[in-house]
């Protein structure tokens, strides 16, 4: 999978950009706040219809314009498809080969992207919601049915919470049963993904860090024993909901389910959040991204595109070198931002392009 060409119009501070990237490495360099990250964001949007900055639609439209346009020509297995994303204050519209797309299934898998930004480290240090969002996005990227299961669960959760807040008990059992049913679907798909990446995560972490450490990732259900869930996932969630019934009615909200669960990042048997150094935490997050890349490669028989934002400022010299050596061995397209080309080792890479980004313009 390769992005052969990208065209931007009125996206953030980028007025009009047309690029023909290299099929391997593309480096956007220049001073801060010039538009480098915006270029990566546009590619991510083209693949996911979402911003990794969690921005409002209006914030992505250039000042003075009514609409942004992001257009890309993506090649896979010798076939090129045109993807166009239109953004305005009301929302987003997607076209595939100039035909409007209304279902996510039609859009899914046409441009697979994985992003690493400096903010990703907050996944380790921050609140559980950040880790859940990472996991949900990773699972959905390789399994479109997960999004349907997740949305169904969220609708049921919303209705159940309305009933709990009202204090009305009539009909609550029905919503509780549905919540357990769809909650199991969400949790099981999350667990399947974590089991799939466990060995990959360990391998990639040690490749990047140049060490031999014990790397684990564990799912931690809220107010529910993981061992019991794995033995009897049909009954464990329902049982936990029964135990919390009185407290839920008192608080007026659902206390158990995948919307409350967390993930533990573990290194050498200890919590990475409390005991890991910054270098270890960054290596772990990068290893998560590399694992995601491998899963997507296996799923679609084609590697995704990797976006690395300001990578060199986040890794020490040894980890940076190990990462670049690792990426050189992977047959995938990579887009990197940096403040200086001196931070990136392009030795031995024949297929690459560098682009100077200054004041919203790209100089070839």
Swiss-Prot record:
Swiss-Prot/TrEMBL GO biological process terms: DNA replication; DNA synthesis involved in DNA repair; double-strand break repair; SOS response
The keyword Nucleus is annotated on this UniProt entry: no
Subcellular location: Cytoplasm
Keyword line: ATP-binding, Cytoplasm, DNA damage, DNA repair, DNA replication, DNA-binding, Nucleotide-binding, SOS response
Binding residues for ATP: 30-37
GO cellular component: cytoplasm
Primary localization class, coarse: cytoplasm
Disulfide bonds: none
Recorded superkingdom: Bacteria
Residue runs in coiled coils: none
GO MF, one example: single-stranded DNA binding
Xref: Pfam families: SMC_N
Family stated for the protein in its record: Belongs to the RecF family.
PANTHER family documented for this protein: DNA REPLICATION AND REPAIR PROTEIN RECF
Role this protein plays: The RecF protein is involved in DNA metabolism; it is required for DNA replication and normal SOS inducibility. RecF binds preferentially to single-stranded, linear DNA. It also seems to bind ATP.
HAMAP family: RecF (MF_00365)
The name this protein goes by in its record: DNA replication and repair protein RecF
Protein's gene: recF
């Amino acid at each position: 999978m390769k992005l052969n060409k990208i065209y931007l119009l009125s996206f953030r501070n980028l007025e009009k950009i047309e690029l023909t990237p290299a099929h391997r490495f593309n480096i956007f360099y220049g001073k801060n706040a010039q538009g480098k990250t915006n270029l990566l964001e546009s590619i991510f949007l083209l693949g996911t219809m979402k911003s990794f900055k969690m921005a409002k639609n209006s914030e992505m439209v250039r000042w003075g314009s009514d609409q942004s346009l992001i257009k890309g020509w993506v090649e896979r297995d010798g076939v090129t498809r045109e993807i166009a994303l239109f953004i305005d204050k009301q929302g987003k519209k997607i076209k595939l080969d100039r035909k409007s797309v209304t279902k996510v299934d039609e859009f899914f898998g046409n441009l697979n992207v994985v992003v690493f930004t400096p903010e990703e480290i907050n996944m380790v240090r921050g609140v559980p919601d950040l880790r859940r969002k990472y996991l949900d996005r990773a699972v959905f990227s390789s399994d479109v049915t997960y999004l349907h299961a997740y949305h169904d669960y969220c609708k049921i959760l919303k209705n159940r919470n309305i009933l709990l807040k009202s204090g009305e008990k009539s009909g609550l059992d029905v919503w509780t049963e549905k919540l357990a049913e769809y909650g199991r679907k969400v949790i099981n798909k999350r667990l399947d993904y974590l089991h799939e990446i466990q060995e990959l995560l360990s391998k990639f972490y040690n490749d990047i860090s140049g060490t031999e450490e014990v790397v684990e990732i564990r799912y931690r259900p809220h107010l529910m024993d993981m061992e019991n869930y794995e033995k009897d996932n049909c009954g464990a969630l329902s049982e936990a909901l029964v135990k919390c019934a009185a407290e839920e009615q008192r608080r007026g909200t659902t206390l158990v389910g995948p919307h409350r669960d967390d993930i533990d990042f573990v290194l050498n048997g200890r919590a990475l959040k409390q005991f890991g150094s910054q270098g270890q935490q960054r290596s772990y997050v990068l290893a998560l991204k590399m694992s995601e890349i491998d899963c997507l490669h296996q799923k679609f028989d084609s590697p995704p595109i990797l976006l690395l934002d300001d990578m060199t400022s986040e890794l020490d010299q040894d980890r940076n070198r190990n990462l670049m050596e690792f990426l050189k061995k992977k047959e995938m397209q990579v887009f990197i931002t940096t403040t200086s080309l001196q931070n990136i080792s392009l030795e031995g890479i024949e297929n690459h392009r560098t682009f100077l980004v200054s004041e919203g313009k790209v100089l070839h």
